[in-house]
Amino acid sequence: MERLVIEGGTVLPMTGQADVYENGVVLVEAGRIVYAGPRDGAPHLAGARRIDASGRIVMPGIVNTHCHAAMTLLRGYADDMRLMEWLQTKIWPAEARMTADDVYWGTALGAYEMLSGGITTFLDMYFPADAVARAIQDTGIRGIVARGIIGVGGPSEALSRLDESREAFHRWNGKAGGRITFMVGPHAPYTCPPDALQACAELADELGVGIHIHLSETRDEVEEARRNWGKSPIRHVYDLGLMKGRHVVAAHCVHVDDDDIAILAETGTGVCHCPVSNLKLASGRTPVAKMRRKGVAVGFGTDGASSENMLHILGSEMRIGAIQAKELEGDPAVYTAYDAVAMATIEAARVLGMESEIGSLEPGKKADLILIDAERPHLTPNHDVFALIAYSALPGDVVMTIVDGRIVYEDGRLTTMDGREIMARVREAAARLVRE
């Protein structure tokens, strides 16, 4: 791994709102941050490649807490439908036709898109796990693989998916220099009966990993849960023991009450906030500010490209999420630009249980960082750099993305794979998958 000296930019380590270093320096060695701060006091790093960051913002890589990356294959297909109708009549039938090769190329395209917009880490729930892991390896992104597990077809269906998850974990966990890690991924309480959820919990304990699950995404889901179990999906999962003593990452959590929020806070469950997908599917608005006041860690997620249509947090989830949080509480001061940037970086890392490794530019942490070109019309002038990022910056403003100290995206080009081949393969597969 080469040594890097990134100098002359506005450095945002995300260690506090006051920590903004104009004409700052970031030093990278052996894939980790050595220094991030003012030029004065920066140690000398011999034999390093020097990167001029003048006119650019240097900040931690963005963390996507919830994604279905391979669903790039279905971008723009079956839009403008209600969630369950969309899943049951369009998405699930198309997914049933996908091959492992399709998923590899779809995930590779998702990774390419994310890296181009500054996302360096993502938590993915999809299948098959081997194809997802291989795409993470080849594109250079950092990814957590949670093989989606559905148990409505009976115990044998869930067990086969659990076996696949276990085998993929032993093949891939820690590979690609540690960029590939795993969670267990029960899809949701409405697709996983209690015995399947218990089996997922047991596998998570066996492998020593966390759990990723969709919870309380729609009003219909919550109402059905109350009819079936007499309680909310979150209370149901909690009472089954899934959230006790394990790291759980819960996607959506839109329709929650005070009891649900108390459970999330008590158990340290991280919440993935996907505002654009939730708005587009008319699922509702997550009470983000209220959750955070109660001590719940919340990070932005994109969901899949078939519901959000883009796998970008900058200029999309971050901007819409910040505005929505203000509108929901009727108070523009309840949620700040810094809050939004934190929810895309260090707080998102906490959601994933990775805050000791990523999410901020601190000595010893993984060298996952991005450079944003601030010399753009929509980023001029700069009165508040956090406001620029939260409300004005766009994915195309990212000019360099670094993962593990390696430049994986630079000036519009993926450096690890042929981006044109990825797009061509996805176009070919997508045309076949939606042919009815």
UniProtKB/Swiss-Prot annotation:
Binding locations of substrate: 95, 147, 161, 187, 217, 303
Pfam families membership: Amidohydro_1
Cofactor binding summary note: Binds 1 zinc ion per subunit.
Disulphide connectivity of cysteines: none
Binding residues annotated for Zn(2+), in chain numbering: 66, 68, 214, 303
Keywords: Hydrolase, Metal-binding, Zinc
Record-annotated membrane-spanning stretches: none
Gene3D superfamilies reported for this sequence: Metal-dependent hydrolases (3.20.20.140), Urease, subunit C, domain 1 (2.30.40.10)
Enzymatic reactions: S-adenosyl-L-homocysteine + H2O + H(+) = S-inosyl-L-homocysteine + NH4(+); S-methyl-5'-thioadenosine + H2O + H(+) = S-methyl-5'-thioinosine + NH4(+)
InterPro entries associated with the record: Amidohydro-rel, Deaminase_MtaD/DadD, Metal-dep_hydrolase_composite, Metal_Hydrolase, MTA/SAH_deaminase
GO molecular function, one term: 5'-methylthioadenosine deaminase activity
Matching SUPFAM superfamilies: Composite domain of metallo-dependent hydrolases, Metallo-dependent hydrolases
Cofactor(s) required, per the database record: Zn(2+)
Enzyme Commission code(s) on record: 3.5.4.28, 3.5.4.31
Alphabetized CDD domains for the sequence: ATZ_TRZ_like
Summary of the function given for this chain in its UniProt record: Catalyzes the deamination of 5-methylthioadenosine and S-adenosyl-L-homocysteine into 5-methylthioinosine and S-inosyl-L-homocysteine, respectively. Is also able to deaminate adenosine.
Entry's family note: Belongs to the metallo-dependent hydrolases superfamily. MTA/SAH deaminase family.
Protein name: 5-methylthioadenosine/S-adenosylhomocysteine deaminase
